[in-house]
Amino acid sequence: MTRILGIDPGSQRTGVGIIDVDATGRVSHVHHQPLVLLGADDFPQRMKLLVLGLADLCREYEPQEVAIERVFMARNPDSALKLGQARGAAISAVVLRDLPVHEYAASEIKLAVVGRGGAEKQQVQHMVGLMLNLKTKLQADAADALAVAITHAHVRATANRLGLSARQAWGRK
């Protein structure tokens, strides 16, 4: 059994989702929550809350691998920069624990979870709920975090069947 932490980075709310995946690739829900960062006075303090929140989750749930959504190009350059900084803070928090990080674009995540790279957010939320047998509707950030974890679980399962690493199976170095 492997535990995967999925991260949907954000500068105000970061979604986190934790799943277990067995040797056959079957996934099960462990935990999900938003890390709400708005309680801090300024942006650097929000990034501190993000790093500390992820460190606490890693201590409590002990994931073995991390999957994170890649930054997309936002219309607002300031928002894109802040999103990139939040992503960097999240990656720093988990690599300090020596966890391997795997990155996936939003279109790759949608393709893996819904079967269509241009799927709507509601479709992702619905499919994640079905895949993990969840009875309550997920918030968007939690669904996205669980979706990136599920994507990595699928890539891992394919890689294992082919005798490759997850990076090799996805065509990455």
Swiss-Prot record:
Q: Which GO terms describe its cellular component?
A: cytoplasm; Holliday junction resolvase complex
Where is the catalytic site?
8, 69, 141
EC number assigned by the record: 3.1.21.10
The record's annotation in SUPFAM superfamilies points to: Ribonuclease H-like
Protein name per Swiss-Prot or TrEMBL? Crossover junction endodeoxyribonuclease RuvC
UniProt entry keywords in alphabetical sequence: Cytoplasm, DNA damage, DNA recombination, DNA repair, DNA-binding, Endonuclease, Hydrolase, Magnesium, Metal-binding, Nuclease
Q: Tell me the disulfide pairings in this chain.
A: none
A Pfam family hit:
RuvC
Q: What is this enzyme's class at the first EC digit? A: hydrolase
Q: Gene name, please?
A: ruvC
Oligomeric state and interaction partners are given as: Homodimer which binds Holliday junction (HJ) DNA. The HJ becomes 2-fold symmetrical on binding to RuvC with unstacked arms; it has a different conformation from HJ DNA in complex with RuvA. In the full resolvosome a probable DNA-RuvA(4)-RuvB(12)-RuvC(2) complex forms which resolves the HJ.
An example Gene Ontology biological process: DNA repair
Report a single Gene Ontology molecular function.
DNA binding
Location comes to: Cytoplasm
Q: Can you state which reaction this protein catalyses?
A: Endonucleolytic cleavage at a junction such as a reciprocal single-stranded crossover between two homologous DNA duplexes (Holliday junction)
Record's function text = The RuvA-RuvB-RuvC complex processes Holliday junction (HJ) DNA during genetic recombination and DNA repair. Endonuclease that resolves HJ intermediates. Cleaves cruciform DNA by making single-stranded nicks across the HJ at symmetrical positions within the homologous arms, yielding a 5'-phosphate and a 3'-hydroxyl group; requires a central core of homology in the junction. The consensus cleavage sequence is 5'-(A/T)TT(C/G)-3'. Cleavage occurs on the 3'-side of the TT dinucleotide at the point of strand exchange.
Q: Which InterPro entries match?
A: RNaseH-like_sf (IPR012337), RNaseH_sf (IPR036397), X-over_junc_endoDNase_Mg_BS (IPR020563), X-over_junc_endoDNase_RuvC (IPR002176)
- What cofactor does this chain's UniProt record say it requires? Mg(2+)
